[in-house]
Amino acid sequence: MTRASLEKQPHEVASMFDGVAANYDLTNDVISLGQARLWRRAVAAAVDARPAQKILDLAAGTATSSQPFVKAGAYVVPCDFSLGMLKVGKERHPWMPFTAGDGMRLPFKDETFDTVTISFGLRNIQDTEVALRELYRVTKPGGRVVICEFSQPTWTPFRTVYTEYLMRAIPPAARAVSSNPDAYVYLAESIRDWPDQPALAALLQKAGWSKVAWRNLTGGVVALHRATRA
């Protein structure tokens, strides 16, 4: 059984992320060859946070992804199902309203947020369609969703090289810098098995979102999907 074939049981995935929380941001920088910071900047530009907006940052981990929204003056709620991640985040940013929550049963009222966003976490939720509907539920009419997730490179020769990198280079790199390298083997397998850009767009539409669009980053290694709640 591969780690990605755990059927993404929440307790299994949460336990993996608990184990990597302390060095999570450093490890991401290493295995992404520094691209993770560029991707976060692209998310911040897409969210375009404004003062007094309410933003849900789902799968926020240690809330590194939340900081650009905070600096823009928005009220940001970092939410994650890994208590280990939340603990590290709270130590770093004690003023933030860290919230434990499952993406399939968000602990928020209907139509709470102006924008909802999730970066590199949608793959880890057991039922993607349920999660997209939950994000829709807690978004105000006219509000937006921004999803940053690993995807499929658009150039076939590069896709082949990228797949080799996922399965052969990430595990040893993770062993060098992570306290739980098995979590990054799971990461590689879950990326390989994840739907491509059009497939995720179709799931967004099925969940009720409108004006669905995406932009490829790093040649499609990552895709930034955007949509609006009518």
From Swiss-Prot:
The keyword S-adenosyl-L-methionine applies. This is Demethylmenaquinone methyltransferase. GO terms for molecular function: demethylmenaquinone methyltransferase activity. Methyltransferase required for the conversion of demethylmenaquinol (DMKH2) to menaquinol (MKH2). It catalyses: a 2-demethylmenaquinol + S-adenosyl-L-methionine = a menaquinol + S-adenosyl-L-homocysteine + H(+). Its EC number is 2.1.1.163. It comes from Streptomyces griseus subsp. griseus (strain JCM 4626 / CBS 651.72 / NBRC 13350 / KCC S-0626 / ISP 5235). S-adenosyl-L-methionine binds at residues 62, 80, 102-103, 119. HAMAP family: MenG_UbiE_methyltr (MF_01813). Pathway: Quinol/quinone metabolism; menaquinone biosynthesis; menaquinol from 1,4-dihydroxy-2-naphthoate: step 2/2. Belongs to the class I-like SAM-binding methyltransferase superfamily. MenG/UbiE family. GO terms for biological process: menaquinone biosynthetic process; methylation. It is an enzyme of class 2 (transferase). Pfam families: Ubie_methyltran (PF01209). Keywords: Menaquinone biosynthesis, Methyltransferase, S-adenosyl-L-methionine, Transferase.
